[in-house]
């Protein structure tokens, strides 16, 4: 299902984004040029798109808009999203911190005031406890892997040349990861970990209930029935 959603993502109706506003300013050709990473003078190319009437005041704004478009393009790339999904599944760390000033009131969550562990190894009862602490505004929770390695994975996919255009794409990759891909993947990990924890909790409850229902109602006592 996630893979299908990735394929549909570029065509999904969306609210106004930084990339869509940059496109409205006519900066998409510049973004496409940068993505090709040809040996061009980036500032000279960007200067051609400076247009105060369209809201592009200088070269920096032209390049920023182009990077916004590139960032959205990378975020909507199905292959990149699948790589990030697998990376998060294998390497995400669930971290819990107490809100400053909530230490005394949130004592029942004291075990999670300063806690972290690999998400894939976290037992369901711990995940659910941390989520409750977050919902009750005692804990801050995040589910993230090491950032540098994630960015390196994206750079291996999208960086094709060591030149000024490639440097612009690198900047767009970092922005894409921090602003778009990482929050999206974290949301997925939250949903998946919640579903897994709920299913495990239900399974434990069902087993305990089965034992209770199958137990002798009067304990180990002899019972005589006469018909």
Range-by-range predicted roles:
Residues 1-218, 222-224:
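Duplex nucleic acid-engaging cores and interfaces of nucleic-acid transaction enzymes
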């Amino acid at each position: 299902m996630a893979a299908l959603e990735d394929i549909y993502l570029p065509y999904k109706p969306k609210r106004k984004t930084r990339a869509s506003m940059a496109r409205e300013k006519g900066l998409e050709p510049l973004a496409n040029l940068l993505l090709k990473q040809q040996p061009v003078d980036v500032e000279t190319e960007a200067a051609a798109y400076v247009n105060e009437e369209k809201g592009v005041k200088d070269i920096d704004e032209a390049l920023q808009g182009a990077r916004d478009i590139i960032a959205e393009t990378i975020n909507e790339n199905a292959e990149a999203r699948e790589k990030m999904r697998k990376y998060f599944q294998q390497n995400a760390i669930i971290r819990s911190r107490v809100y400053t000033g909530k230490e005394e009131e949130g004592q029942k969550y004291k075990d999670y005031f300063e806690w972290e562990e690999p998400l894939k190894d976290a037992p369901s009862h711990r995940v659910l406890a941390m989520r409750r602490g977050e919902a009750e505004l005692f804990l801050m929770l995040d589910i993230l892997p090491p950032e540098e390695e994630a960015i390196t994975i994206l750079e291996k996919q999208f960086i094709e040349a060591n030149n000024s255009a490639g440097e612009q794409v690198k900047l767009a990759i970092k922005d894409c990861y921090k602003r778009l891909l990482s929050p999206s993947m974290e949301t997925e990990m939250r949903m998946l970990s919640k579903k897994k924890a709920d299913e495990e909790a239900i399974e434990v409850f069902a087993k305990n209930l089965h034992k209770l229902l199958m137990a002798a109602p009067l304990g180990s006592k002899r019972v005589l029935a006469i018909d």
